[in-house]
């Protein structure tokens, strides 16, 4: 696996691979990699001949008071994990390489509606930062396909919409959430949790799973379901950001006759913000 730091080097390496007739896959990350990221790279390697990953902690998607400065930078360990997972090329640019004229004058990409609400409500500008950096990376790599984790469900919806609306010829693949044995979704931010907080954190998954099971059994009073779920999270020591049942494709509030649903949440354990979701496809409408 080679590591490059400039757009010119990146494009030259990708051009060589494409000139050899190889199908190109891309996995963008912010580093501090775990088994969930490795699963994305493995999926990419299964679908393509040449896998490009990026590591870039994107300042444009962090708001005031968020963890930009303390977000772990672990390049050497990340390189080893990417190599083991089947990555061929790592792009690890500086902020100056990505935003040479500065972020204040950077052209922005905004995906309305899908970026609003849920994480967008408590993190204004976040998805604009995500869409902007991902569109830049897509233009730099020009992959045939890109792989994203389903844990970031709203982000995946935003990226799919951006690719569709801007006519980008890129297949977007979602990879199921990788979890610890106790159900906690793997996240780079789990490392911020104290041992006591880590022991309590799986309650987020248990709550979502219980809500999903109730829906499968026919529960359609989503307001009551959310209220019960929130009480469980409160009892486990979480501080609320949001807990919702939404239509999985549009992210609008769920309606009783919807077949594709997502139970989705963000909550704070101490100062650490955790997100998770469970997707449901209902084959038959139940009473």
UniProtKB/Swiss-Prot annotation:
Assigned GO CC terms: cytosol
Keyword set includes Nucleotide-binding: yes
Residues binding (R)-pantoate: 61, 155
Annotated SUPFAM superfamilies: Nucleotidylyl transferase
Catalysed reactions, semicolon-separated: (R)-pantoate + beta-alanine + ATP = (R)-pantothenate + AMP + diphosphate + H(+)
Binding site for beta-alanine: 61
Record EC number: 6.3.2.1
Molecular-function GO terms, alphabetical: ATP binding; pantoate-beta-alanine ligase activity
CDD domains associated with the record: PanC (cd00560)
Pathways per UniProt: Cofactor biosynthesis; (R)-pantothenate biosynthesis; (R)-pantothenate from (R)-pantoate and beta-alanine: step 1/1
UniProt keyword annotations, A-Z: ATP-binding, Cytoplasm, Ligase, Nucleotide-binding, Pantothenate biosynthesis
Bridged cysteine pairs (disulfide): none
Top EC class, one word: ligase
Domain of life of the source: Bacteria
Positions that bind ATP: 30-37, 149-152, 178, 186-189
Homology family: Belongs to the pantothenate synthetase family.
Summary of subunit composition and partner proteins: Homodimer.
Function field: Catalyzes the condensation of pantoate with beta-alanine in an ATP-dependent reaction via a pantoyl-adenylate intermediate.
Misc. remarks from the entry: The reaction proceeds by a bi uni uni bi ping pong mechanism.
HAMAP family: PanC (MF_00158)
Name under which the protein is recorded: Pantothenate synthetase
Organism: Pseudomonas entomophila (strain L48)
Classification of source organism: Bacteria, Pseudomonadati, Pseudomonadota, Gammaproteobacteria, Pseudomonadales
